[in-house]
């Protein structure tokens, strides 16, 4: 209809999260890998006091994010003492999505480069690249353990021209498949030349407790992304951060929007960092629940479930499961299963050729088990 809209947006599909809609039943929201617990009341009260006493809503937020950057650097060094990070190594975004977009602008926009991803993986890398007109090269993963097809990746790097691959995006652990980078993948990442940006998304670090932050000094072309949306319970406030060489940070700061992070979001992020030990104390419970769910789903012949290093599980249907669903394909069967669970009150995500189920509270997980067993 409008000829001024870029033609290459016609085939682009926007990221579409579930909508709770007007459902009258209790919904167990296990589709977006959030923490199942809200902030404690005492911290919410403290945030309310900060909002009332310290934040002037008629003033723009702190555009330098300096206090928040210093708090983030302190946290990174506490959990990874050998990282030796300072505020100069930190850039803050309105969620990690903004930082992904900024990294794409810094490296690839204007025909300067392509990006490489290994699917299935987090879809926003490709979506954001396409919105910027950046070519995306996808390689596969091994079906057994979802390890990156390194041979295919190397071939893509060597043969992709005009533009060549300038950035590689990996998640550690991967979403939706929940596997952490293994030794072969790490050897490959360490071997990549300095003229390729390596983006390691550690959104689920607090659950996996595996990080590459201590290697940043040896690999100045690496960037680590993290978020406050998962373990720190601030999904509604959209705070993410990048850890990288100061020169990369300087360029990220050049392309980000001014005043990109509201004062309330900055205050909340600083508050949760000051109470990180208490807030993260729920993680052992999530890991126990994950182990229970993995064992339970593994006993259902209709399901194939993979081990997880994150706060979610990934599964597909076996041949028996496909037969029970009465569909001709994995995709159709998974869509049908997802919809049946939704009508019963459990939201999960159908993505990457499988189903991704967030680990919820014990009660939510029990309801999910009962509903899945009721179907099979």
UniProtKB/Swiss-Prot annotation:
GO molecular function ontology, one term from the record: histidinol-phosphate transaminase activity
PANTHER family listed in its UniProt record:
HISTIDINOL-PHOSPHATE AMINOTRANSFERASE, HISTIDINOL-PHOSPHATE AMINOTRANSFERASE-RELATED
Keywords from the UniProt entry: Amino-acid biosynthesis, Aminotransferase, Histidine biosynthesis, Pyridoxal phosphate, Transferase
Name of the gene encoding the protein in the UniProt record: hisC
Q: Does the keyword Magnesium apply?
A: no
User: What pathway does the annotation place this protein in?
Assistant: Amino-acid biosynthesis; L-histidine biosynthesis; L-histidine from 5-phospho-alpha-D-ribose 1-diphosphate: step 7/9
At the top level, the lineage of the source is Bacteria
Stated name of the protein? Histidinol-phosphate aminotransferase
List the catalytic activities from the record.
Answer: L-histidinol phosphate + 2-oxoglutarate = 3-(imidazol-4-yl)-2-oxopropyl phosphate + L-glutamate
In the record, biological process GO terms are: L-histidine biosynthetic process
Instruction: Look up keyword Cell membrane and say if it applies.
Output: no
Similarity section: Belongs to the class-II pyridoxal-phosphate-dependent aminotransferase family. Histidinol-phosphate aminotransferase subfamily.
- Per the UniProt entry, the Enzyme Commission number(s) are 2.6.1.9
PTM sites of type N6-(pyridoxal phosphate)lysine: 230
SUPFAM superfamilies from the UniProt entry: PLP-dependent transferases
Question: Partners and quaternary state?
Answer: Homodimer.
Database matches in InterPro entries: Aminotransferase_I/II_large, HisP_aminotrans, PyrdxlP-dep_Trfase, PyrdxlP-dep_Trfase_major, PyrdxlP-dep_Trfase_small
Cofactor(s) the record lists: pyridoxal 5'-phosphate
